Amino acid sequence: MRQAPVIHLRGLDSSIGHALVERIFRTDAHLVVPRKNYRDILQRYATELEFGECELHAADQLDFASGHRLMLIGLGPFDEPSDGENGFEVDGLEIILTAPAHLGIEVDTEWVDSLVLVHDLLPRVKDSTWGSSLFNQWMTQLNAHELPSLKGETKHWWVSDIDVADAFVRMLMSDEAFPGQLKVSGRRAWSQAQTIEELSLLHARTMAGRTGQFSVEHLTAAPTPSIEVKSLIVSPSTPMSREENSQQRPDLSPLHDVLFRIDGDGWRPLVPIRTALMHALVDYVQ
């Protein structure tokens, strides 16, 4: 009989951390969280815990053991007083570190089993670690009634934190080990101009909704932007200039392959970017 997996999460004070908790509560896993987050999660998800199959534990209630999985989210620190002298050095404990790619941090991967870099995430709350500084700049300009400005010619491969969390949980709930290195992003390239156009329209509609001052322009259906879909496999010619590299989408084939082995679906983000942009801007106009 299959045993419910034990998943330890550290670094939950982020949009992607919240999304992971929400998604795991739809499974039968044992979820282990830091003591400081335990009571808030217990209260916030009381209904899911009462009627669902997932069980919640604080870190000092369930120790690391062989076969458990530990996902570290963000930049840390990740240690808990209950970890003891050995910390994460437990035989058979799979350690996955996931970090925002845009920060360009160098990680010593000797102590982790997998390093996952997430590109162009659209978090549903303001997040200085995971959110794009360029997105933050655009929202600041829009709120000041200014036209968002372009910065270079970089493209973005936007992806919702909901889709990223879903992919992570599909892997965490499976018997498949996380690949040693993994990159996550959306599959479609968005130019800055396309993103600004879409974001400006959504911002205008949101502000009109708050004030009740709608115009025909706000209520007219916006055309769907022409977005290019790229192959999952990226095989760049070398050497590449910095500008060429900024146009190159992360190689998603390892992510797609492991998800395909798990359930046959592969990497197919379901949240439309227009919806993800709407989720992302809401916290800026509260």
Question: What residues fall within each predicted segment?
Answer:
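Flexible, charged surface loops at secondary-structure boundaries
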Residues: M1-A4, F25-R26, L62-L70, N86-G92, ...
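N-terminal Rossmann/SDR dinucleotide-binding element
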Residues: M1-S66
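Amphipathic terminal alpha-helices
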Residues: R2-I7, V21-V33, S241-Q286
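Short, well-ordered alpha-helices that flank and scaffold nucleotide-derived cofactor binding pockets
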Residues: H18, E22-R26, D166, R170-M173, ...
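Short, aromatic/basic amphipathic alpha-helical patches
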Residues: L20-E22, I41-L49, D83-E89, I105-E110, ...
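Conserved Rossmann-fold NAD(P)-dependent oxidoreductase catalytic core, especially the SDR/UDP-sugar
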Residues: A59-D60, F64-V125
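NAD(P)-dependent short-chain dehydrogenase/reductase
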Residues: E106-L172, L199
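Mid/C-terminal beta-alpha module of Rossmann-like enzyme folds, strongest
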Residues: M171-S246, G264, R268-Y284
